[in-house]
Amino acid sequence: MVYRGFGLEHISPPVNKPFAEMTPEEQGERGAQMMMEFMTSCPGKSAISGVTGFALGGVFGLFMASMAYDTPLHTPAPVGAGPGAGIPGAPTLQQMADLPLKQQIKIQFADMGRRAYSSAKNFGYIGMIYSGVECTIESLRAKNDLYNGVAAGCLTGGGLAYKSGPSAALIGCAGFAAFSTAIDLYMRSENGRPPKNDFDE
C-alpha cells in the first residue's frame, strides 16, 4: 500500500449543525465564538468603546465636580447680580448660604449628577466614534500600524469640531491626531525588539 500523504482534501469540514442539536459543550463553544467575533468586529469595538468611555467619563465628571468646591454650581451668579446672570434657575451664593444644610447637599449632588452625565456622554460619544473610525480604516488598509490611529484621530477631531468652522476642525484634527499618536506610541513601546539575551533589560 502506497502512502499518499495527508493533505487538505482528506480533511472533512466541520458539520454546521443547528444550535438546538448541539451538545451543551458545543453550544458553549459556539456562544463563545460568536461573542469573540462580535467583540472583534467594528460594531462590537464601537459599542464596547462607547460603554467604556461612558463609564470612565462619568467617573471623571463626578470627580471633577466634587473637586469644584470653591465654585459651587459651576459659576453661580454673584450676590446682587441681575436675574439673567449665572446658571438659569440656580441659586446665588447668598441664597445657597441661607438654605438648610440638607437642601444645600441636595442641590450639590444634583449638580454633580448633571456634570457627571454630561462628561459621560461626551467621553462615550468620542470613544465610540474614534474606535469605529479606526476599525474601519484598519479594515480598509488591512494593516495594523501607527497610521490607523493618526488618521482616526484626525477624522474624529475634525468631525466633532466641523460645526465651529474650518479653523476649529483643523485644530481638532491636529489635536486628536497628536493625542492618539502619543497613546499609540506608548502602547506599542512594549512591542519592541526582544533583548539579545535574558540578562539585558
From Swiss-Prot:
Q: Which domain of life is it from?
A: Eukaryota
A GO BP entry is: protein insertion into mitochondrial inner membrane
What is this entry's stated membrane topology? Multi-pass membrane protein
* Disulphide linkage map: 42-135, 154-173
What GO cellular component entries does it have?
TIM22 mitochondrial import inner membrane insertion complex
| Bilayer-crossing regions | 47-67, 146-162, 167-187
The alphabetized UniProt keywords are: Disulfide bond, Membrane, Mitochondrion, Mitochondrion inner membrane, Protein transport, Translocation, Transmembrane, Transmembrane helix, Transport
Q: Kindly list the places in or outside the cell where this protein is found, as annotated in its UniProt entry.
A: Mitochondrion inner membrane
Its biological purpose: Essential core component of the TIM22 complex, a complex that mediates the import and insertion of multi-pass transmembrane proteins into the mitochondrial inner membrane. In the TIM22 complex, it constitutes the voltage-activated and signal-gated channel. Forms a twin-pore translocase that uses the membrane potential as external driving force in 2 voltage-dependent steps.
Q: What is this protein called?
A: Mitochondrial import inner membrane translocase subunit TIM22
Species for this entry: Eremothecium gossypii (strain ATCC 10895 / CBS 109.51 / FGSC 9923 / NRRL Y-1056) (Yeast)
Gene giving rise to this polypeptide: TIM22
